[in-house]
Design a protein with these regions (language model features):
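Non-catalytic beta/alpha edge segments that cap or flank active sites
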Residues: 1-103
Length: 103
């Protein structure tokens, strides 16, 4: 929760979203999230699927804790970059909504 005290708008975790026994990022983050954002998770997988068939195996997780956007993305540099490409700049609208702005 240090990020909250620092006033972070976004926290990005990379790695641990695959299927091996040590890939536990989604399980670690899920109980901490106030709400998931399944549409952003779907956008990440869909965007990746256009580039590699293995993206369907990714378990990226997206949600919010209070007014902070939390992203659990693939650990590979390319996977993380493509995930960010998939959701930005549209993800910026999340901050407007969290601060009481319109949809």
């Amino acid at each position: 929760k240090h990020y909250e005290q620092a006033g972070a708008n976004i926290v990005v975790y990379t790695g641990g979203t695959g299927l091996s026994n040590r890939d536990v990022t989604p399980e670690a983050l899920a109980p901490l999230l106030d709400r998931n954002i399944p549409g952003m998770e779907e956008a990440i997988r869909s965007y990746g699927q256009e580039r590699t068939p293995y993206s369907m195996l990714s378990r990226s997780i997206v949600g919010v804790i209070n007014e902070t956007l939390v992203l659990g993305l693939p650990g590979s540099t390319n996977g993380a970059k493509e995930s960010m490409d998939a959701i930005f700049p549209a993800a910026l609208h999340v901050f407007q909504i969290l601060r009481g702005g319109g949809h």
